[in-house]
Design a protein with these regions (language model features):
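Surface-exposed loop and turn segments in beta-propeller and other repeat-based domains
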Residues: 25-40, 82-98, 144-156, 202-233, ...
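Beta-rich, blade/repeat-based domains predominating
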Residues: 41-54, 94-111, 116, 151-176, ...
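Conserved beta-strand positions in repeat-built beta-propeller and related beta-rich domains
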Residues: 60-66, 115-119, 124, 174-184, ...
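Beta-propeller blade signature
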Residues: 72-78, 129-140, 188-198, 370-389
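Short loop/turn segments immediately following beta-strands, especially the blade-tip
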Residues: 139, 196-203, 265-275, 316-324, ...
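Blade-level signature of beta-propeller repeat domains, shared across WD40, Kelch, NHL, RCC1
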Residues: 345-403
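Extracellular juxtamembrane-to-transmembrane boundary of type I single-pass membrane glycoproteins
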Residues: 399-414
């Protein structure tokens, strides 16, 4: 079987400090769900994924990694601050493998929600047909498609369906499988799943990078959160986790959670590799400052990276078309801030970057619901202003201009500077022509 080539590339990183401030959008101590006529507290409900629809509604996933998680997918009510099962409580029924069993990753675009169902409940073996991608129409709340993954694509004993990005240009979904075994004595079997969304009458999916070294957890790496070791007896072993698709849909970035490495793949090469068994080059895109969970690419060619070891959020700016060099910037205000413990998933809405901080490393047994170690709240949604930036699904918009007075002034000054520069060039050129003419005249006089 033809394997992916792994190319090591030397990349220069520049750490810069950004003064971009962050703000608390909402924080809560215990997750509260709102059902038909009553509210209920859930101490085993940990928020993980977060996304926005076009109307600004907030959707949050609560994977059923523990008992009594009443709903695995919910809509956040910004007025009551309660979570409402979405699209309904019935669709969140974990006793039915056809319903939403355990959701972590999902994506929203153009009125459609793509929900990735892990199928794994409280560490048990997933039921038949429970590992799937479910597609809903937001407005009607109707399910429009269901893609059930067969064993050769997602092995129930190992599959841990984690993150998802949508390639709207090719109508494909890329899904990270962290490959965490049910039996922790076994080795991880992570990989990447490519799902064809065009085919609706049957599953059309391919698994690549199966147990490739770049998707495996780093066996020598022991994760620390705010300098505190995660798991005392054995290191946390999680393979490929966060994935991000570039705004031109040409490059897929990924990183194992138990690692500080960042990798990328050219999409066309990867698809050609699948079709003709040709070589596909994995690019080592750099050594990150710390381990990451969520990744997110933006319309302005920024790669946003969570830093779970310290609570930082990083921005990797692509400054070369061939992705051989990246420029890192850092939100200074997040450094060492315990309130951002374990930033999990990223989302962009209304020129703001949002993320959930959920203390995954402490959940659920070391969570203090009476006196949270992170302050007043155990869980938080933060945001930071990211002017002129948007979701990768909107496509690249590198030349986008915000026509505010300040930016107009900058562009006017820039245009004037260009005109002045060109005038000097023209003047210099004219002078040079005069000198040449004079020299030619002198030569003519000497000859005659």
């Amino acid at each position: 079987m033809n394997k992916f080539l792994f190319q090591i590339l030397v990349i220069k990183f520049t750490i810069q400090i950004s003064e971009t401030p962050f703000q608390l959008f909402y924080g809560w101590n215990i997750t509260k769900f709102s059902f038909n006529n009553y509210d209920i507290n859930c101490t085993t409900c940990m928020p993980a994924g977060i996304k926005f629809d076009n109307e600004g509604n907030i959707y949050v996933s609560f994977p059923r990694w523990f008992e009594n998680v009443y709903a695995t997918f919910a809509l956040f009510n910004k007025t009551t601050h309660l979570f409402q099962p979405w699209p309904s409580l019935e669709e969140n029924n974990y006793n039915d493998s056809n319903k939403l069993n355990s959701v972590l990753g999902f994506e929203i675009f153009n009125g459609t929600i793509y929900i990735l169902d892990q199928g794994r409940i409280n560490g048990s073996l997933p039921k038949d047909n429970s590992m799937k991608l479910v597609v809903y129409d937001i407005k009607s709340k109707n399910r429009t498609r269901t893609y059930i993954f067969p064993k050769e694509i997602a092995d129930p004993e190992f599959a841990f369906l984690n993150d998802i990005v949508i390639d709207i240009n090719r109508n494909l979904a890329y899904i990270s499988d962290s490959g965490i075994p049910i039996d922790d004595k076994k080795e991880n079997k992570p990989g990447l799943i490519i799902l064809n969304l065009t085919v609706t009458d049957k599953i059309n999916a391919t698994r690549v990078l199966d147990s490739n070294e770049t998707v495996m957890p780093d066996e020598t790496f022991w994760l620390h959160i705010n300098k505190t070791k995660v798991k005392e007896n054995s290191p946390m072993k999680t393979g490929i986790d966060g994935i991000a698709l570039s705004c031109d849909s040409n490059t897929l970035f990924y990183t194992p959670l138990t690692s500080r490495m960042l990798y990328s793949l050219n999409i066309d090469q990867m698809l050609e590799h699948i079709k003709n068994k040709s070589h596909s080059i994995i690019i080592y895109s750099g050594f990150k400052k710390e381990a990451s969970d969520g990744l997110l690419y933006s319309s302005n060619d920024n790669l946003y990276i969570t830093g779970i070891e310290s609570g930082n959020i990083y921005i990797a700016k692509n400054i070369d078309d061939d992705l051989l060099r990246m420029d890192y910037r850092e939100f200074k205000v997040l450094k060492g801030n315990i309130s951002t413990m374990w930033p999990d998933t990223l989302a962009i809405y209304d020129a703001k970057l949002f993320w959930i901080s959920n203390q995954l490393n402490n959940f659920p047994h070391n969570i203090n619901f009476d006196n949270p170690i992170t302050g007043n709240d155990n869980f938080r949604i933060f945001y930071a202003e990211i002017e002129n930036d948007g979701n990768y699904l909107l496509g690249c918009n590198l030349m986008k201009i915000n026509w505010s007075f300040g930016n107009i002034a900058i562009w006017v000054i820039f245009a004037i500077a260009i005109l002045i520069f060109l005038s000097f060039v023209i003047m210099g050129s004219n002078k040079q022509e005069d000198i040449i003419d004079k020299n030619m005249n002198l030569d003519l006089k000497d000859n005659y």
